[in-house]
């Protein structure tokens, strides 16, 4: 079996049928998600920081709070438009504030709490209470003041929270156990600096909150994507924002199961094709290349959202995807068993055959992969590339 040999159904015929439809499907009719105006960004940012700063017994709404920060950055009207464009007929409920009636802040003002639709007031109050209690204890224990970047009010606290969301973003396509395991393992590595600043952060529980949110409120995926793309299109940004964009683009694109190899795709077309490919199961073979070429990059995302395990891509007519195929081959076990999991033998053989054919036709561009020396050596050994012929592939 080879990738070239996979016979695919005639998608052009299917597209012709679909184009004849004069109707659209309304989803989430009557659903009422919370939308927070930009004027409350400071309050939402602080709540995000409080979630990170202290240990809490309940993190169920952590992801929702993170998405409300997204709402404040995009703006309430734009947020509602994004939700509408995603096909969701939802009725937004604006977030408000209310006076707690007890206790005052450092400026002597009455404490104002956020009233987020769908989030119990008691939950918000408990998070705030625990964070203030932890802050008071830390201030007492420290000889000097707590650095600003270690406080709940740190400006990049919401971005750190959303970084965990980006790490879990593609995981609803896998099992909860595997998805969380992968995301948490990677978070402990890439969020190392944040963990030093916020040592009480509970990454597994926050990741679980995002997993549940993206699974239950699918329309939030579109909002998260638009935020990531908007942030990534900006030429400036903090260190945390740059980290988020890096994580997001890999999550939006290659996903984590492709190892580092999947990150080589430079366009959203390539990236989405790569992700769908690595989620492949031969029982559900679907050709998406023509779909992407016809409908643009969003078709790849649509395909992933509607059928996460959509099937193995046939890339026989897509020579520009050589690097992506090699990345898939790597993630699926050709360069070694991935995390001890037995690969799909048919898929293994197909990807191996295609990778070898690319090597033989000098189409593998190692210089574009950004490999470590160890990865490059593994690839060269697998494909039997000798020193004399090495330059043919760079």
UniProtKB/Swiss-Prot annotation:
Source species, domain of life: Viruses
CC annotations in GO: helical viral capsid; host cell cytoplasm; ribonucleoprotein complex; viral nucleocapsid
Record bears the keyword Repeat: no
UniProt-annotated stretches for the region Disordered: 131-153
Alphabetized UniProt keyword annotations: Capsid protein, Helical capsid protein, Host cytoplasm, Ribonucleoprotein, RNA-binding, Viral nucleoprotein, Virion
Compartment(s) where it occurs, according to its Swiss-Prot or TrEMBL record: Virion; Host cytoplasm
Chain intervals with Polar residues compositional bias: 136-153
MF terms in GO: RNA binding
Coiled coil ranges: none
Primary location recorded for the protein, binned into one broad class: virion
Description of how the protein assembles with itself and partners: Homomultimerizes to form the nucleocapsid. Binds to viral genomic RNA. Interacts with the phosphoprotein P. When in a monomeric RNA-free form, interacts with the phosphoprotein (via N-terminus). Interacts with protein M2-1; this interaction allows the association of nucleocapsid with the matrix protein.
Family: Belongs to the paramyxoviruses nucleocapsid family.
Function as written in the Swiss-Prot or TrEMBL entry: Encapsidates the viral RNA genome by forming a left-handed helical nucleocapsid that protects the RNA from nucleases. RNA replication depends on the availability of soluble nucleoprotein. The encapsidated genomic RNA is termed the NC and serves as template for transcription and replication.
Listed name of the protein: Nucleoprotein
Gene: N
